[in-house]
Amino acid sequence: MSILFSSILFSIATFFSRILGLFRDVLFAKYFGVSYELDAYFIAIMFPFFLRKVFGEGAMSSAFVPLYSEKSGEEKDKFLSSVINGFSLIILALVILSYFFPELIINLFGAGSSHETKILAKKLLLITSPSIYFIFLWAISYSILNTNNKFFWPALTPSISNITIIIGTFLSTKYGIISPTIGFLIGSILMFFSIIKSIIKHKYYFTIKHFPHFLKLFFPTFMTMVVSQINTVVDMNVVSFYDKGSISYLQYASRFYLLPYGLFAVSVSTVVLSKISNDRKNFNYHLNDALKTTLFFTIPSMVGLIFLSTPIIRFFYEHGAFTSKDTLITSKILIAYTLGLPFYGIYSTISRSYHAIKNTKTPFIAATIVSLSNIILDIIFGLKYGPIGVALATSIAGIIGVLYLLFSVKTFPIKDFLKISLNSLIMLFVIYLTDFTDNEFWFLIQILIGILVYLIFSSIFYRDLIRRFLYARKK
């Protein structure tokens, strides 16, 4: 099964989860708008969510998949037990830390927040902290399934968390922000139990024999992801010193930016990690294939989101407590974020490819460059322009990081990039021609027209990618 076809299966599952996530945020906008309660919620879930990003989409899979795929029989079971036993102790310490020193974590993600926001966030953090352990177990199960080239169901499991949070949000009219917070915890538990079979089929050993060896590969990838996620910490802290609700603005806008990123960039990078881990001799072939696929989806997504940002935000969010002013601010933030979409797609693909061949140094240097650039640019743009400046800083930092990675890997499908860019510009021109009404539903028609035009011209100028997809599907 090709990278393209595997990525599309992954994307279908991710799309369902992201749509539920979008519906969840629509409900947030309706019930909470841009408020200190929602800011407190985002701060409280950021610690477990931060670890989920590190474990689920980064260090855990990047270190676990190559080592796990090398082992067989009893050694595979002992390796899995070692990782679970070793990390259980570490995560227990993190949970205890969050219970006894919640102020440290609150200040880590929202130092500039108001007193009432911090007080509420502290209460909510006590609810979300236990989810860390279940997120870790989910990440292990997720990695095992990916190693066996099973991508669809693992990618679908985050939908469970979105569903429980949605239920909690509906109950918020009676219980307030507490109910979606409890929904977050329940969702984390159910996510693990939905794929627990991949772990329990292995024989358990009371050992940490392989854990030190695993840490040698995990620690550099972990530090790479931590450095990458520092951007999120810095972003939230900078906007927390801005107007009340700025954290909420940032989260609302990032939802639409992360939709195509999760659908395409994360999907491709997850698949290419497994492909290269099992076929390292063809590193360049798999990397180029992955880059083409990433560009094929992220460039038109960027173009469409930039042009249609305002009608998209208005349609989904401008209800209840969310005002037209909020729409204008959020759409500008979305544009600033979206400028970096293709670059973060390339960044993710190349970084995971390096991890597959156990090269952790290059991704770490790239992550450090991105993080330092983001911190400097946050200070320059964020403190002056608030969440819009923070989003722009994120995009520019991603571009800088990609330039370093491209210089390092010395390969890039430039001809494919030009073809895809041309097709995307043609798509944009057609969307522009159809922009003749203020009907709030019309942008949906424009999206469908844009997709159709893009696919038609891609079939003319980019036949090889379409042909490879059809061939992979037949296989």
Curated annotation (Swiss-Prot):
UniProt topological domain (Periplasmic) ranges: 24-35, 100-123, 172-175, 239-249, 309-332, 384-386, 438-440
One function term, GO molecular function aspect: lipid-linked peptidoglycan transporter activity
Keyword Transport: yes
Keywords linked to the UniProt accession: Cell inner membrane, Cell membrane, Cell shape, Cell wall biogenesis/degradation, Membrane, Peptidoglycan synthesis, Transmembrane, Transmembrane helix, Transport
Signal peptide: none
Cytoplasmic side: 1-2, 57-78, 145-150, 197-213, 272-287, 354-362, 408-416, 462-475
Consequence the record notes for mutating R24A: Loss of activity
Annotated effect of mutating R52A: Loss of activity
Location within or outside the cell: Cell inner membrane
Effect of mutating N162A: Does not affect activity
Known outcome of mutating R255A: Loss of activity
Recorded GO CC terms: plasma membrane
GO BP of this protein: cell wall organization; lipid translocation; peptidoglycan biosynthetic process; regulation of cell shape
Residue ranges of the TM segments: 3-23, 36-56, 79-99, 124-144, 151-171, 176-196, 214-238, 250-271, 288-308, 333-353, 363-383, 387-407, 417-437, 441-461
Primary location recorded for the protein, binned into one broad class: membrane
Pfam entry (one): MurJ
HAMAP family per the UniProt record, alphabetical: MurJ_MviN (MF_02078)
Functional description taken from the UniProt entry: Involved in peptidoglycan biosynthesis. Transports lipid-linked peptidoglycan precursors from the inner to the outer leaflet of the cytoplasmic membrane.
Similarity section: Belongs to the MurJ/MviN family.
Protein name: Lipid II flippase MurJ
This protein's encoding gene: murJ
